Amino acid sequence: MTDFDLAGIGIGPFNLGLAALLSSHENLSNVFLERKPAFRWHEGLILPGTTLQVPFMADLVTMADPTHRLSFLNYLAVHDRLYKFYFYENFMIPRQEYDHYCRWASQQLSACRFGEEVVDVAHESASDSFIVESRSASGGKQQYRSRNIAIGVGTAPFLPKWAQIKTLAPLMHSSEFGRRRLELSKRRRVTVIGSGQSAAECVLALLNDLTPEMVAAGASIQWITRSAGFFPMEYSKLGLEYFTPDYMRHFHRIAPVRRREIVADQGLLYKGISFSTIGEIFDLMYERSVGGRDPGLALFSNCAVETLESAGGSGSFRIGINHNHLDEKATVETDAIVAATGYRHAWPEWLGSLKGSVLDTCEWGDLVVGGDFRARRSDGGKGHVFVQNAETFHHGVGAPDLGLGAFRNAVIVNQLLGREHYRVNASASFQKFGLPSSQTAPSSISGDFYAHAS
């Protein structure tokens, strides 16, 4: 069994970024394990014309170490694309390119091992280490001993109860849209449910596939959401400061119960639609409605889906909806459904065996994750369990944001080193999130803070 300083479980952008930063520190042995055979990032939503919703500097390393060999700019240099990107004049890079960049980076990191699914993690009391057991696609098993682990398993597509029915007609989560788009184009009536960016991108793609001739023959798209409208995501410069280390630190000072209440009211900071996507959809509808024509897309807000059933043997659905304000009900028929209903954390089963005995839990049964991204130990042990992309009620709306990944990883690496190698305490925002009387510079993390982690 091989011993490591850190074992990363899951290789998404955040753990990949951690592996990238650790590649600069040869004294810290590490291994990262991923079930998939290779890195892929939201492959079902890498549609033509789609971009990241954050600037390219939200890559794996730049916000912690701009000179790192695995930065996006160095990726461009290696692939002879610097001048092309220079003339591209757009901070928002294509999703296809971001995925290719991450795959390129993963291929430079020998610590990343794909095709190994972590099936169990147990705590070894004698050494205060974690025994990580993985299984390959062929069934072979491997064990690793690590003093610390970093959980980066990410989220899984969420389908509400009404969508969990068996049917022959297409009923899919938006994460499947890319690979099933052709199938949808053959259906006469398609309904998209949800009003976030993923829903809007699915609607735009379907609308681009829908010709005026198809509309004249009866084809149509319905876009339904329970939200009050199809609203844009907050993207003002001061609004973006909620995605900084400053706000993350401030948010973590708030009482846990209050945090959950606050996050519930901050949806449009990260759940809305980009202005450009809204504009493209509206402009297409405007153009296609010239002369009183039907543009082929109907939008319905404040309509909550309550029931879904197959419409006999016709290969279609009946959707039961309720209008939130009118409290009136209606039934609509459709031949296919795209449920853009978001994602939920899918914590691995083995984590349950560590809760209580090794890791503290809160009154809701969740891990207690500190401002340093460590899950609090219940047994007094010194080995750390770092949590990547914890729920937003731990660290605020920026927890899943790519732009904060490098900062979080810098904090983690500093703890593994036992010193502040990466500067993580500098103020990053103009606004102050606390009281005026507390407008002081961020306190420095002392050497003692790092010493206990080394």
From Swiss-Prot:
Pfam families: Lys_Orn_oxgnase (PF13434). The keyword Calcium does not apply. The keyword NADP applies. Pathway: Siderophore biosynthesis; rhizobactin biosynthesis. Its cofactor is FAD. SUPFAM superfamilies: FAD/NAD(P)-binding domain. FAD binds at A7, G8, I9, G10, I11, G12, P13. Belongs to the lysine N(6)-hydroxylase/L-ornithine N(5)-oxygenase family. Its EC number is 1.-.-.-. GO terms for biological process: rhizobactin 1021 biosynthetic process. GO terms for molecular function: oxidoreductase activity. It comes from Rhizobium meliloti (strain 1021). InterPro entries: FAD/NAD-bd_sf (IPR036188), Histamin_N_OH (IPR031043), Lys/Orn_oxygenase (IPR025700). Keywords: FAD, Flavoprotein, NADP, Oxidoreductase, Plasmid. This is Rhizobactin siderophore biosynthesis protein RhbE. PANTHER family: L-ORNITHINE N(5)-MONOOXYGENASE, MONOOXYGENASE.
